Amino acid sequence: MLSSAPWVRIPLPPPIGNRMSDNNKDISEFFREVPPFLKVFNITNAYPTDDDQFVVEFSPGEELTHSNGMVVQGGFVTGMLDCCMAQFLIYKAKGKQIPLTLDIDVKFLRPCAPGPLKTVANITKQGKSICFTEATLYQNDKLIATSSATNKMVESPF
C-alpha cells in the first residue's frame, strides 16, 4: 500500500484557480490520503499517462477471493474498474466535481487471481454533466476484464 502522500502520483496543476469548494483545498489535498474503500483493494499506485489515460494499480489479497483463494470476486473487479474511471474524472475536473456512476457494464474475459493488477481508464465522451468512460484491467499483461460506464458529474462536497 502507498505510504506517502499524495497517493496519486500526478503532475499537480498550479494551485491558483484550482481550489476545491468551501474548505479551500486544491487538487493535491483531494488526493492526499487513500480513501478507506481503496485500502480494501490494496491500491499501490495511480497516475495519468502522457496519452490522456489514467492508470490505477492494485494488489488484491486472498480476502477478496472465492474458490479457495484462487479467484478475485467479480464485484471487487468491477469496483477496481469503477475506481479507475472515477479517479480519472476527478483528476480531470481538478477535484471540483466528482462522478456518480449511473451505469456500468463489465465483461469478464479471464479469471482474476490475487496479486498485482493494472487498470487503465479513458474518457470516451465528455459533456457538460454526463461523461462516458471505459477501463480495462490487466494481470501479467493479459486482459482480464473490460468496462464502460456512464457518469454524472456533480459539484464536489469536499
Predicted segments, located by residue:
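Intrinsic disorder/low-complexity segments, especially N-terminal tails and targeting/processing regions
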Residues: 10-12, 18
